[in-house]
Amino acid sequence: MTVRVRFAPSPTGMFHVGGARSALQNWIFAKQRGGVFVLRVEDTDAARNKPEWTEGILSALEWIGIARGSYEGPYFQSSYAAEHRTAASRLHEGGRAYYCDCTREAVQARTGSPHSGYDGFCRDRDLGPGAGRALRFRTPDEGATVVVDLIRGEPTFENRLIEDFVIARSDGSPVFLLANVVDDMTMGITHVIRAEEHLPNTPKQQLLWEALGVKPPVWAHVPVVVNEKRQKLSKRRDKVALEAYRDEGYLADAMRNYLMLLGWAPSGDREIVPWPVIEEEFRLEQVNPSSAFFDEKKLRAFNGEYIRALPVAEFVAACQPWLTGTATIAPPPWQPDEFDADTFAAVAPLAQTRIAVLSEIVANVDFLFLDSPLIDEGAWAKAMKEGAGDLLDAAITAFTAIPSWDAESTKSALEAVGAEHGLKLGKAQAPVRVAVTGRRVGLPLFESLEVLGRERTLTRLRAARVRLP
């Protein structure tokens, strides 16, 4: 038997990080078994679907390593409407479904509760199709439905507690439960790996599989992804769009490494693991069924580690969208003709150790490509206290006099200036750093001065001095 898994997102918004994790888990599971990964776009919500969301899904999958052309599809659920209707008719003709004209208000009036569920009122009324009549599945009165789940064992659901659920609306269109099952049957899906939130629907879907005469797939319900308050990640409340992380400058390798750790751990005590090792070691049976915390701070730290591990040439290439202004986040304040690739290459190894996401590169190097630094007034107020003017005067004199302009020489000169003013180097360099770079923190100061050059450094020190009494 060829293993066939599917990833079935809906094109109704940005691509959710939880969906990305499910896609990767399906992808690895199929790859380990020489199987097939099927992409099915569940596009039946015409009011919310947009072509750009579908393209966003394809682009996001490609970014995390699931390239176009390496999987089967994409198929579109809307293309299978005829199959959905045929399945609904089979269930009705076989006595496994019946028409119902009950409104919610009528059910509530009979049961006395808005939460009691459907009471089976129309089971034996022998209604035919018509306006206001939905098609309901006839759930068995006895027995239990056992779901074989690779992560959760064998959850068992008493059939008498499963209400007769709707499988087709009064206009004949199928609901999600039926369409999903029919599509999986049509595509020969053998394993369904998806989020825990779908588990309550699983006994209903398994009953549909059995009623249609097909062996159900093997199920695997991975833990739901939650925020720091243990709430399910929400598009309205949390930062969940994979594209947002990509655009901010997270690396794909860091992102997919982190996503795979949501509910699973590799061997040993390591967490940053080469992708081939993850592909080899991952086992669905080892996934923890408890909720998985999406820790953005930890992801950020992961990304910083991945950035620092890049060869410098790859780091320089990765920064290009932000340096050239083609990125959508953190546009550079300089004009294209002001950017100098050689200058950036000189400081790239210094910047590489100080950023956690690529978009931070602009704020770290902007002072190198502007005529004047962008002064952070808060940093200015803290650095330019009493005595700062005298210290800048002394630094200008010292920097003018040194015979060679390099990091070691400028450091020695400023150390001497600081000693004359009773200051250690850390205190002495604060006014100089703000005057030259505009910020209190950033790249190593003296290496930055070397790249900036003597004349530009002195020009900025003099400009800062003019602002002081």
UniProtKB/Swiss-Prot annotation:
Binding of ATP, residues: K235
GO biological process, one term: glutamyl-tRNA aminoacylation
Location (main, coarse): cytoplasm
Motif ('HIGH' region): 9-19
Positions with a binding annotation for Zn(2+): C100, C102, C122, D124
Cofactor details (free text): Binds 1 zinc ion per subunit.
Subunit structure: Monomer.
PANTHER family linked to this entry: GLUTAMATE--TRNA LIGASE (PTHR43311), GLUTAMATE--TRNA LIGASE, MITOCHONDRIAL-RELATED (PTHR43311:SF2)
Protein name (database record): Glutamate--tRNA ligase
